[in-house]
Regions:
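Bacterial N-terminal signal peptides that target proteins for export
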Residues: 2-12
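Detector for methionine-enriched segments
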Residues: 1, 14, 97-100
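Sequence context surrounding c-type heme c attachment/ligation sites in exported
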Residues: 22-154, 158-198
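Bacterial N-terminal signal peptides
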Residues: 12-21
Length: 199
């Protein structure tokens, strides 16, 4: 008579479940990190702080990570911004960006350009709050094969003062794990144009 260990099927199912969860997590992060990982004030730091890509100190790689755009904007205007890696030897790259006013509150709305960027939707695996809809943008799965991304940002109709864009970037070695990758942060400040008409 063959004796079957009743705990064996449960153990196998547990291993399969954990393996599936690990695979989904790796795939999810390749399609864009969770929200609030730009390094901005009140964010949860970067992907390095989440324990995901923490092999090296922040901004310790040789690449140059930057945000470029206009120096000013008009209230209600839609402007274009570019997030870039230069002098990078990484095989895959990614980013996440948000914009904040002088009181460290999210400001404006982002809009994706093409298929390499996406506005983070609320209430999925990335954990974006409903009230922050439209305020975070990042790479897509196809976008992690790029080193440069263009996005749009729509200023509020009554925007004033200085807006600071915060971005975190991942320079990855493409080995399918979260080790050996460099995380960078950068900022860009632009100012709302003053209304001078009639003066």
């Amino acid at each position: 008579m063959k004796i079957i260990n009743k705990s064996t099927p449960c153990f196998v199912l547990m291993i399969l479940a954990l393996s599936s969860l690990f695979t989904r997590t790796l795939f999810a992060w390749s399609t864009g990190p969770e929200a609030y990982r730009t390094g901005a004030p009140n964010d949860k730091g970067t992907c390095k702080d989440s324990g995901c890509h923490n092999s090296f100190p922040l901004n310790s790689g040789d690449a140059k990570f930057s945000i470029t755009g206009p120096t000013s904007f008009a209230p209600g205007e839609t402007i274009k911004l570019k997030v870039s890696f230069n002098s990078s030897s990484g095989k895959l790259h990614g980013f996440e960006m948000t914009a904040m006013d002088t009181n460290d509150n999210q400001i404006g709305k982002f809009k994706a350009i093409g298929k390499t960027t996406q506005v983070i939707p609320p209430k999925d695996y990335r954990g974006l709050k409903k009230e922050d809809k439209g305020t975070y943008i990042e790479h897509t799965l196809s976008g992690n094969k790029k080193k440069r991304w263009k996005v749009k940002w729509i200023a509020p109709a009554k925007a004033t003062g200085t807006v600071t864009f915060y971005a975190a970037g991942n320079e990855a070695n493409g080995d399918g794990t979260n080790t050996g990758d460099y995380i960078y942060t950068t900022t860009l400040e632009i100012t709302a144009a003053s209304a001078t008409f009639g003066q």
